[in-house]
Structure formats: C-alpha cells, structure tokens
C-alpha cells in the first residue's frame, strides 16, 4: 500500500495500526526525513464514506493512486464539518512505548524477570527511534530509573534470603543487570533530574514538544564523517562491522566489545566466526593480565559455541585453537597469582574502569570455570573421535591430541590444588574432584607403559611445580598413580565420583592380571546391588569392568569364574549396546530419534573398545568346557535335574547338531562348535586343534601361555566327559590307561577322579594300591534303563494331559467316566444312556480320573523288576 493513501474517518485506530505493520523500516525513515507535509495533507483530507474510499483506494492501479489531491479543492468545505484524527508515526511509536512500559511494570509486580528482560530490549529499540539528540522520552526515563531501583532491591533480597530463583528468572535478572547499568549511563542526567523531583520532571513537557530538526539526517552526516576519518587513519587497525560501521580496537575499548559480543551470544543470525576474529584481535592488543584473562575466557566460550550450533563435533582447527588458548589462560593465571578465575565470582559491570585490588584484598576475582572448559575440551575430542573412521590414519593423528589434553587436565588439577590452599577462597571440593576424575578417565584403561609416557610429558610441561595429591616420587609407576587418584576420590567424594573411582581401579587391576584383588574389590563394593540407580555412563563403566574381570579370570585359567562373570553380558546377546560399542538394531521396539541420538553420543571411542570377537570366543570356550561334561553327566543320570549353564551356548550347539553337512570352520563360533562335538566324542586332541587354530588368541598378551592353559583344560574336561559317558560299561579302569589316553600325569588323573568322587558325581572308589578306579554297579542306570524310564514318564504325562482335557470339555460333570458296556449302554433297556450310573460289567474296578493309578504296564513292571 502506498504511503500517500489516506486513512478513513471511522477506523482511525485500526487503519493506523495496519499502516504501521505495512510500513517498512526504510519507509518510516524516509517519511520522517521528507517532513510532515504528506501526513498533514492526508490528515487534512476527508471522505464522506471511509469504507468505500478505503476499498476504492485499495483498488487503484498505476498512476491513479497518486491522484488523491486532484479533488482536494472540492473537499475543503467538508473539512470544517468533519474532523479526522490520523496518528503520525511518532504518536504510534509513543503508544507502543507506553504499552511496553506498562508490560515492564506488570512484570515488576509479579517479579517476572524473564518477561522484564524481553520487554527491556524491546523498550530500548523503541526509545532509540524517539530520541531527539541526547534526550529520550520522559516515560522511558521513568521506566528505566524505576527498573534499576527495583533490580537493586531484588539483588539485595537475594543476598539475604536463602530461597533461590528459578532458572528463567535468574537468567532474566542477570541479563537486565548486565545491560541496564551500561544503558543508564547515557541518560544519567535525565535520571538524576527524575529522581530529584519526579512530579516536576514528568509535568515539564516543553522539551518533548520542541520538534527535532531532522535528527536522522544529521546522524547520517556525522556517521559518514566519522567513517571517513576512520578510513584515513592508517596508524591503528579497524574492522568494518554491520552496516558499514568501522570498529576501532584499542585497549580501552576491549571490555565494550566483549560486552556487545556476550550480549549477542545465543541469538539468531549471529556470525560467530566474525566474533572470534574480533576477540583474537582483542587478545593481541590486550595489555593487562585482567584484559588477557577476560578475552581468553570469552574466546574459549565462543569456540565451544561453534560446536554446539551445528550439532557435530568441533573442528580440529577450532579444537586446537581452544586448547592453546586454554593453555595460555592457565599460564597467565600462573604468572599472575593475584588474578583468579572462580565460578562464584561476581560479574564486573564497569566496562570503562577495570577492577583493582582494594585494601585488605589479595585477589581480583574473575567469573569463569576452568574445570568446565577442561571437561568441554575433553568431550569435544571424544565427539571428534566418534565421528572418524577408526581404521584410517586420521584417527591416529586425532588421537595424538590426547597428550595435549592430558596436560591441560593435569594443569587444571594443579591450579585448583593451589586455590584450595587458601581457605578464605572457599573453593568447592567438587571442582578438584572433577579434574581428578577426568585425569583418571584417561589412564584407567591404558597399559602401564602408555601411562608412564603421559605422566613424564605432563611433568615436563609444568616444570618445577609440585602436587600434594600426586607427588612426583609417588606416581612414577602407573599402579601407584591409579591407586593415589582413586584413594583421594574415596576419601573426598561421594556418589558417582566415588563409584566411578572404584570401578576404574578394579578395571586397572583386572587389566594388569591382578584377578583376586579386583574380584574382592568388586564384591566388597556391593555395586552390583545399586548400579541400576546410577547414570547410564556409570552403568556402562560397570559393564566394562565386569567384562575385564571375566577376561582376567580366563587368563588365570579360572574357567568357571570367567564364565560366571561374563554370563550377564555375553548371555544377553546385547554386548555392543551394554558396552557402548555400537547401537543395536531394534526389530520390534521403536526407538525415537532423540533416544538414538543420545545412544550414539554415549558410544566410546574405538581405542577404548573391548574386542567383542575375543570376548565371544572366551565366553563360548568357557561354556564348552563346562557344558560338555555336564551334558555327559545328565545323559547317564536322568535323576539329576537337567540344569543349563549357558542358554546361548546350548542354542548354538543344538543348531550345529541339526545341520546335515558340516563344512570346515570359518569363524570363531564354528571352531568352538566343532571342538565341542569332538570333545563330547572323547577326541580331545581334535578339540584342542580346533581351539588352537582360532586366530583371535594372538590379540591376548602371552598367547602361547593361553593356548597351553586351554590344552590342559581340554584334557581334564575330556577325562571327565569320558568317565561320565562310559562309567556304566566298566567294572574297573586303570589310572595308567587313562593317563595314556589323555596324556596326563597319574597324579593329575587321581586328583580329578578323587574330586569327582567327593562331589558325588561319580559312583566309584579309587584303589590307590592297585592304581585303579572301581565302579559301583546298580547305582548308575544303563542306557536301556534310562530310555525306559524316559518313555514311562512321557506316557504318564500324556495320560494326565488327556484326562485333564476331557474334564475341561465335560466341565467337571460327575459320573463322566461311569459308562456301562463300553459305550454307556446306548440302546439298552433304559433307553438312551441306559445303565448310566450302574455297576460296570466284567469285574473291572472303577478308575479315578487323573491317572493316579497308572503303573506303567508291562514296561513299568520290567523296570521295577
């Protein structure tokens, strides 16, 4: 709609608001610059029917819409009769300003700082359009003066009352606190006049009634001149900002630029790359330690903001830059002991005057958190490693940055150690615990040689500094370092940090083959009872520790302990998910995108993975050594309850036995299944050959010792399987014969047989004089007897199920089984159902339902005989 279009009589307020929405910012500025002539003409003219004219005006096309003034002479007479009220742009802005002031006042009544912060920004934008030189509208001055007083009252109450604000109110209050003091400095003279006499200030309207002679154009001229001067100045450097404004960087303007950058943080359409370049320039010209610290803190935060915006990992360039800046920040803090960075420090609001040490003060406190930046740097490296293909050289190059990160973590620990020496600072223990926990997270899963290299490089980086928690002389060995870090967290932390420290130490001990100590710590911690109440990352660490303890037991030759420990993880079939080494494909459960995203974020980097193929191989091998003798034992003794050690292994074995043709083994699972089949048949040498041919054993330390241990285990379990299978066919069996068959020493054979006899697994006696095993007859059933009893049990179960089915169909009717003549006397003298209820012929006794009188017939009698 053209700005020359005239508003109607009856809808002055509606048309004015509609016009305001349709006007662009450029049109409004041009309208003010060109003067009020067109507004006066539009307000002076009038139509007899506003609705019809508005419609007609809206339909005019081309040059016709500019012919409104052609018949103005005919309407001069009607102007005297009908008065039209059309609001100017200035009046409309004043109305908007008044509504915003009212909204702020309402927010102050209910203490809603979130809405106050929003309306305060809106108020400043509106007041900027209404400024005449350095003078602002009086209602604006009143609003910001009252708001500053109210803010000071609220801050005073917060220091006295222990009740805290909610997060939204706290953020709003902090935002207003940061902006209002800087904003009110520009209007300090007017604010002082208002506070001196509020009534007189608001009643005096002479200043507002004086028209401003085209302030916009004057501002433009002055801006152009300033820009020209800046362009001519070649001594310093300048950056052109938005709208062609020239930004001057001087040591005095550092805090002003930082303030503007921090205020725009988190807003849309913010060029973070440009902000980082500005802060890098500010860092170059910073002179005082306070300026350098403030710039570095803001710069590191801005780099991390880039990582969160895209949802991906921080780029390598930005990560390395953040690492260097954080290292430089720690260096500056070390060189200037009177400057400290604390989370509890208050924000310094005066951008023109930096803080100085007052009498009785030892430190200049700067708000910030070194440990939070350190944790974020660690998390960004982890996210980067998650996104890189682990089988490329890029992953190795990226992993090399862990050394620099470990140095940062170590220096952060030393920094908080130094702060905690001064009790007056009241540094929370949690900050130091977080730094130590991060350090422990980077060493617990590594071999001792790698940890030693990391520690040596870290101590070289810090020079002559000393640590009270981890002294140099006590942390030379990796085991000592892990023990010192864990003991400190045991004594000075609670909850998650304490549990994670316990799990890290158990993992480290199991990784370095200290099985019995790691097992005892795991049992004494009782974490298995409370682990479900911890967070997901701690549960993942618990699963990893459990698996590592199981692998350690296997390396020690403790097959039963290893299988029992690995059962929970490997028996579930969800090893990838439980160990955070991959996302399982859900067939039936629909996983939301948010859950899948969180699951992927929790994945561990590849260098922390436990080899799942090796884990499966260990689990299946242990299950084979336990299940095959058990199957042989239960096969010859049906009275023994058939228990299952590993359902996963049993299913694999049954599937393998159902195959008609079995080819050569191709993978780990095939090797174990064919070894199981050979072991069950007594061919222990063949089983050993299959197990030794698995190539995954080479990934374990001391692979030859592992293979030797497995060969001995297979020999012993082969002996047990042979005795369980063929005991019913022997009266006596020489130990020397068994020794030759299984290539074991006679003493070992005697020990195995004695153990089986003592556990009542074998009905026999050991004649140590003649070195023979004497089997007792009548205790173990023969194969035929076992099959006969099995058939008897199945027949009895079939009869019982049939009679239960019949009872259900007849609905428990009495006399359901009392039928005469085989078919209930159908067609007899008593008609249909004759003889029902009478005695049976042939001398047969009545049989009760339920099959309780079944005796097994001839087969059962033969078995009983």
Curated annotation (Swiss-Prot):
Q: By its UniProt entry, which SMART domains does this protein fall under?
A: PINT
Domain named PCI is located at 606-780
Q: Where is the composition biased (Acidic residues)?
A: 16-54, 69-80, 226-235
Top-level taxon in the UniProt lineage:
Eukaryota
Q: Biased-composition ranges for Basic and acidic residues?
A: 82-92
State where composition is biased (Polar residues): 808-817
Q: Where is this region: Disordered?
A: 1-92, 206-243, 801-865
**Role summary:** Component of the eukaryotic translation initiation factor 3 (eIF-3) complex, which is involved in protein synthesis of a specialized repertoire of mRNAs and, together with other initiation factors, stimulates binding of mRNA and methionyl-tRNAi to the 40S ribosome. The eIF-3 complex specifically targets and initiates translation of a subset of mRNAs involved in cell proliferation.
Q: How does it assemble?
A: Component of the eukaryotic translation initiation factor 3 (eIF-3) complex.
Q: What is the protein's given name?
A: Eukaryotic translation initiation factor 3 subunit C
The gene is NIP1
């Amino acid at each position: 709609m053209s700005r020359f279009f005239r508003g109607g009589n009856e809808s002055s307020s509606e048309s004015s608001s509609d016009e305001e929405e349709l006007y662009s910012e450029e049109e409004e500025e041009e309208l003010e610059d060109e003067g009020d002539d067109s507004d006066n003409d539009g307000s002076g003219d009038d139509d007899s029917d506003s609705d019809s004219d508005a419609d007609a005006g809206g339909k005019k096309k081309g040059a016709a819409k500019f012919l409104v003034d052609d018949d103005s002479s005919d309407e001069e007479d009607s102007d005297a009769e009908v008065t039209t009220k059309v609001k100017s742009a200035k009046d409309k802005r004043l109305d908007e300003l008044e509504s915003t002031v009212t909204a702020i006042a309402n927010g102050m009544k209910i203490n809603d700082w979130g809405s106050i912060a929003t309306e305060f920004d809106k108020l400043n934008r509106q007041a900027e359009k209404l400024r005449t030189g350095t003078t602002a509208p009086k209602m604006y001055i009143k609003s910001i003066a009252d708001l500053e007083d109210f803010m000071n009252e609220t801050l005073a109450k917060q220091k006295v009352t222990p009740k805290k604000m909610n997060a939204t109110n706290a953020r709003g209050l902090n935002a207003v606190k940061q902006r209002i003091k800087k904003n009110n400095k520009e209007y300090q003279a007017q604010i002082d006049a208002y506070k001196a006499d509020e009534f007189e200030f608001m009643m005096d309207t002479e200043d507002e009634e004086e028209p401003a002679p085209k302030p916009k154009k004057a501002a433009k001229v002055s801006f152009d001149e300033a820009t020209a001067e800046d362009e001519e100045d070649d001594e310093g450097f300048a950056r052109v900002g938005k709208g062609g404004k020239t930004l001057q960087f001087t040591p005095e303007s550092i805090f002003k630029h930082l303030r503007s950058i921090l205020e725009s943080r988190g807003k849309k359409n913010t060029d973070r790359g440009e902000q980082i370049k500005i802060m890098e320039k500010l860092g170059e010209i910073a002179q005082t330690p306070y300026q350098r610290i403030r710039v570095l803190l803001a710069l590191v935060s801005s780099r991390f903001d880039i990582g969160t915006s895209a949802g991906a990992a921080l780029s390598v360039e930005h990560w390395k830059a953040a690492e260097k800046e954080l290292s430089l920040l720690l260096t500056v803090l070390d060189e200037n002991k009177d400057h400290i960075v604390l989370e509890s420090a208050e924000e310094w609001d005066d951008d023109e005057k930096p803080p100085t040490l007052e009498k009785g003060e030892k430190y200049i406190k700067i708000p910030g958190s070194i440990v939070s930046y350190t944790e974020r740097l660690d998390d960004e490296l982890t996210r980067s490693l998650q996104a890189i293909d682990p089988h490329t050289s890029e992953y190795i190059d990226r992993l090399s940055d862990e050394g620099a990160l470990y140095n940062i973590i170590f220096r952060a620990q030393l920094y908080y150690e130094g702060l905690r020496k001064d009790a007056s600072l009241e540094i929370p223990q949690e900050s130091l615990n977080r730094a130590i926990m991060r350090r422990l997270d980077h060493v617990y899963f590594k071999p001792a040689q790698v940890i030693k290299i990391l520690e040596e490089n870290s101590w070289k980086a810090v020079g002559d500094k000393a640590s009270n928690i981890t002294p140099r002389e006590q942390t030379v060995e990796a085991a000592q370092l892990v023990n010192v870090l864990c003991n400190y967290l045991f004594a000075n932390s609670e909850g998650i940090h304490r549990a994670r420290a316990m799990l890290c130490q158990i993992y480290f001990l199991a990784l370095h083959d200290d099985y019995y100590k790691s097992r005892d710590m795991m049992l004494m911690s009782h974490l298995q009872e409370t682990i479900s109440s911890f967070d997901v990352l701690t549960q993942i660490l618990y699963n990893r520790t459990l698996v590592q303890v199981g692998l350690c037991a296997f390396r020690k030759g403790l097959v039963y302990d290893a299988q029992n420990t690995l059962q929970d993880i490997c028996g579930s079939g969800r090893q990838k998910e439980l160990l955070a080494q991959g996302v399982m494909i859900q067939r039936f459960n629909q996983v939301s995108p948010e859950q899948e995203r969180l699951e992927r974020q929790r994945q561990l980097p590849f260098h922390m993975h436990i080899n799942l193929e090796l884990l499966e191989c260990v689990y299946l091998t242990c299950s084979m050594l336990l299940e095959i003798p058990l199957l042989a034992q239960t096969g010859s003794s049906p009275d023994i309850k058939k228990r299952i050690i590993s359902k996963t292994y049993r299913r694999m074995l049954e599937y393998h036995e159902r195959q008609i043709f079995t080819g050569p083994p191709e993978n780990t699972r095939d090797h174990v299944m064919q070894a199981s089949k050979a072991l069950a048949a007594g061919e222990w040498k063949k089983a050993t050959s299959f197990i030794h041919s698995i190539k995954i054993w080479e990934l374990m330390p001391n692979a030859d010792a592992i293979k030797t241990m497995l060969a001995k285990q297979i020999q012993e379990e082969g002996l047990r399987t042979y005795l369980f299978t063929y005991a019913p066919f022997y009266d006596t069996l020489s130990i020397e014969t068994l020794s030759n068959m299984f290539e074991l020493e006679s003493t070992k054979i005697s020990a195995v047989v004695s153990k089986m006899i003592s556990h009542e697994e074998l009905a026999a006696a050991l004649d140590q004089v003649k070195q023979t095993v004497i089997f007792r007859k009548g205790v173990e059933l023969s194969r035929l007897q076992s099959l006969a009893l099995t058939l008897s049990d199945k027949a009895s179960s079939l009869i019982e199920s049939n009679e239960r089915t019949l009872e259900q169909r007849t609905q428990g009717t009495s006399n359901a089984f009392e039928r005469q003549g085989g078919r209930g006397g159908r067609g007899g003298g008593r008609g249909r159902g004759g003889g029902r209820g009478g005695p049976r012929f042939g001398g047969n006794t009545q049989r009760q339902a339920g099959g309780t009188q079944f005796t097994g017939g001839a087969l059962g009698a033969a078995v009983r005989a």
